Amino acid sequence: MGAMAPRTLLLLLAAVLAPTQTWAGSHSLRYFHTAVSRPGLGEPRFISVGYVDDTQFVRYDSDAENPRYEPRARWMEREGPEYWEEQTLVAKGQELDYRVSLRNLLSYYNQSEGGSHTIQRMYGCDVGSDGSLLRGYEQHAYDGRDYIALNEDLKTWAVADFAAWITRSKWQRNGAAERSRAYLEGTCVEWLLRYLERGKETLLRSDPPEAHVTLHPRPEGDVTLRCWALGFYPADITLTWQLNGEDLTQDMELVETRPAGDGTFQKWASVVVPLGKEQNYTCRVEHEGLPEPLSQRWEPSPSTDSNLLLLFLELWQFL
């Protein structure tokens, strides 16, 4: 996305930003495309969503009353009408391309025209703290399965099956990898720098997590300790349970980081421990918003101590 803006303008922008802007950690620009055929119900639906790091900032939906690229972050509302016109034209062109691809894939897989099928695509770039490219990527899937992907060298394609081999042969002839590489190494980085500058109050902030530990008795007689991290941004965080200072990564249950709905994230990690040994276990929380890692233990209240004693007596009587 963004390829229609004058490249000279983007290069000037990158030259201005690069010497003065540095950021903690890496940042990413990613686009997710989904095209779904629906025989008998009209043309395929096409949705494009863009993310800077973990923040959705643009969206296009062909099923909208007036399909247009629209802002999904307040800082994107500063973009002028020319930007939205250009991006809408790009999206409409992509929509037409996916219609053709859906028809081609029917023939590649010898499928009938009566069923619904889905193409998914993810592409983008990551930059380091100095604004230089760390990596670029482009991946395609068909009906939920890997189809074709750009290798790390950004020069060759990895294919999943014979149908994807047909696509690779076409793309090798028309220079698709070279175009993707030029976009990922140049335009993608330039637009990411622009978006980071545009939304720096939101995108470059560091909200530290609030952490605490809860205890949950189990029928087996032991207990689960769950370490919570809430209200943090960006999403990258590390939770590690330790026993007497030794990591317990093999014994932990760890959920994926989840959006909290208010622009921050939440996550938890749990471990099963013997009843009465809770104080030997520590949860270590690492996040860029913290000046140093947090160490959290379960802190029982007086009422909790009484409840655990009753639980122990009940289990002892049962045994």
UniProtKB/Swiss-Prot annotation:
PROSITE patterns linked: IG_LIKE, IG_MHC
Residues of the Ig-like C1-type domain: 209-295
GO annotation terms (biological process): antigen processing and presentation of endogenous peptide antigen via MHC class I via ER pathway, TAP-independent; antigen processing and presentation of endogenous peptide antigen via MHC class Ib; immune response; positive regulation of T cell mediated cytotoxicity
Region listing for Connecting peptide, in residue ranges: 299-307
Keywords for the protein's UniProt record, in alphabetical order: Disulfide bond, Glycoprotein, Immunity, Membrane, MHC I, Signal, Transmembrane, Transmembrane helix
Gene Ontology CC terms: external side of plasma membrane; extracellular space; lumenal side of endoplasmic reticulum membrane; MHC class I protein complex; phagocytic vesicle membrane
Glycan attachment points: 110, 280
Subunit structure: Heterodimer of an alpha chain and a beta chain (beta-2-microglobulin).
Protein name as annotated: Class I histocompatibility antigen, Non-RT1.A alpha-1 chain
Organism field: Rattus norvegicus (Rat)
